[in-house]
Amino acid sequence: MKTTAQTAPARSALQDASDTQLAIELIGLGARPQVVEAEVTLSRSRVYRLYRELTGGSPPKGMLPFSADWFVTWRPNAHASYLLSVHEYMQQRAGLPGIRAVLNSYRVYAEHMKANNEECLISFTRFWTLVRFCEGGLLQLSTCPCCGGRFVTHAHEPLASFICTLCQPPSRVRRSVRRETPHATANAPAAVLGNRPPVAMPGFGMVPAL
């Protein structure tokens, strides 16, 4: 009895082009190949080839960032809180779905940091991981009862015990602030700081409220 081999369905040329363009955008913002593979249907070999062609080098080895605790430490928390607030805006107000909201949010963050001659504390891969942590119920945006700002916290953290890192910065930060002028927060955003005077945050350029 003659048998015929089943052939895989032909891949759409339009889908292939769309995935390739998305992969290029992701890699351009610094996404590691594992992130790209999770967002597109391109083969691993093609993703890695694109990465090498676009960056001129091999991707970093090792696992993706996996610590949710890192996002609630002082400086990362300020950056993460802003990024997540922009991401929420992109989804709810701009109507951007999924990875498009992540891409546009990170572009806003990166452009602002560049305009202030500062480096991005949070890489695109870390931001992508942050969004996954929130979607998985590990982290969330919580409102500080002191200033009304919204900050990244562990999910289901009792709000009665939560005070943001701007209202109650670590002691080492308070000592540093006494030695510095508070010019870094002269234009701190109402979306983050609420109605109280800003606390100096070295290394983080403040952004206008969205």
From Swiss-Prot:
Keywords, ordered alphabetically: Activator, Bacterial flagellum biogenesis, Cytoplasm, DNA-binding, Metal-binding, Transcription, Transcription regulation, Zinc
Protein's GO biological process: bacterial-type flagellum organization; positive regulation of DNA-templated transcription; regulation of bacterial-type flagellum assembly
Cellular component annotations (GO), alphabetically ordered: cytoplasm
InterPro entries, sorted: FlhC
Leader sequence residues: none
Cofactor note: Binds 1 zinc ion per subunit.
SUPFAM superfamilies named in the record: FlhC-like (SSF160930)
Molecular function terms from GO: DNA binding; zinc ion binding
Keyword DNA damage applies: no
Cofactor(s) this protein requires: Zn(2+)
Main subcellular location: cytoplasm
Subcellular location per the Swiss-Prot or TrEMBL entry: Cytoplasm
NCBIfam families: PRK12722.1
Description of how the protein assembles with itself and partners: Heterohexamer composed of two FlhC and four FlhD subunits. Each FlhC binds a FlhD dimer, forming a heterotrimer, and a hexamer assembles by dimerization of two heterotrimers.
Main function: Functions in complex with FlhD as a master transcriptional regulator that regulates transcription of several flagellar and non-flagellar operons by binding to their promoter region. Activates expression of class 2 flagellar genes, including fliA, which is a flagellum-specific sigma factor that turns on the class 3 genes. Also regulates genes whose products function in a variety of physiological pathways.
Protein family per UniProt: Belongs to the FlhC family.
Name the UniProt record assigns to this protein: Flagellar transcriptional regulator FlhC
Classification lineage: Bacteria, Pseudomonadati, Pseudomonadota, Betaproteobacteria, Burkholderiales
This protein's encoding gene: flhC
